[in-house]
């Protein structure tokens, strides 16, 4: 079973449609690799992280 985990700043997912679109797109991408028969077994987890706990280049985003 493919398991795909995405972590991003939580503000990216304020609109619930954003997470739905990302989940669908990642599932479709995995199916191009594993085949359509894998679709029922592909898990996608989208995790929003507060900007204060997300760092880039050694510094928190907030």
Question: Can you say where each PLM-predicted feature lies in the sequence?
Answer:
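A domain-level signal for the structural core that forms small-molecule/cofactor-binding pockets
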Residues: 1-62
